[in-house]
Regions:
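Carboxylate- and glycine-rich phosphate/diphosphate-binding segment that chelates Mg2+/Mn2+
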Residues: 42-149
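A short glycine/serine-rich beta->alpha loop
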Residues: 75-76, 147, 160-167
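Gly/Pro-rich interdomain helix-loop hinge
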Residues: 161-187
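A short beta-alpha structural unit
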Residues: 109, 133-137, 160, 177-182
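Feature representing long, continuous alpha-helical segments
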Residues: 140-141, 155, 159, 175
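Glycine/threonine-rich beta-strand-loop-alpha-helix active-site module
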Residues: 1-71
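Short, well-ordered alpha-helices that flank and scaffold nucleotide-derived cofactor binding pockets
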Residues: 2, 144-145, 163, 182
Length: 187
């Protein structure tokens, strides 16, 4: 919606050369539980001239509606389902402690892992698909980061990978997370 509602090249917004002044109202029809875009203020695009992938966050870009029907994800390959689950888990990345928020995040992570395991055996399990879809939405609407600082380094690192290569975002996150976690462990 930013490219339609703002003068100039939309890439100027994503590369931080200017702020968006408006956004064409957008909606979402979920076909994969992953990034939580349906309840997020963030969006990501890839500039194919240089293969650079960047995100932009602004409340103007929030979806005005979302269709969330778990049945639309039944035919999703299990690989993509697992990539989506990894993506969801990577949004629980606060750097500071706050017990209530941490417990909400913990419950969502347990649910994501539990329901992903169910879907590996039963891809058309409505409740597992619905739970994964709802966890995706809640993971990226700032419920689990409200008032806390977050570390988005893994996403920034992965954007460099999937900007240049045909890699699913969740697979790229899974590849970089372990090294990043070891690097920041003592901080």
């Amino acid at each position: 919606g930013y490219g339609v509602a703002n003068e100039g090249d939309v890439w100027d917004i994503y590369s931080r050369k200017k702020e968006a002044e408006a956004c064409l109202p957008v909606g979402a029809v979920l076909t994969i539980a992953a990034a939580g875009s349906e309840m997020s203020w963030s969006s990501v695009i890839t500039n194919e001239d240089g293969w650079i992938k960047r995100g932009y966050s602004n409340d103007l870009g929030r979806c005005r509606f979302a269709v969330m029907n778990p049945e639309l994800t039944y035919t999703l390959p299990i690989y993509q389902t697992k990539c989506g689950a990894v993506d969801i888990l990577m949004y629980f990345n606060t750097e500071t402690d706050f017990e209530v928020t941490d417990r909400i995040a913990e419950g969502l992570m347990v649910s994501v892992i539990h329901n992903t395991r169910i879907l590996m055996k039963e891809p058309e399990n409505y409740n597992a698909r619905a739970s994964l879809m709802w966890a995706s939405s809640l993971s990226h609407n700032n419920l689990t980061g409200c008032g806390l600082s977050s570390d988005w380094a893994t996403h920034q690192l992965e954007h460099e990978v999937s900007g240049m290569f045909d890699v699913a975002h969740g697979a790229g996150l899974a590849a970089v997370w372990g090294s990043w976690a070891r690097y920041v462990y003592e901080e």
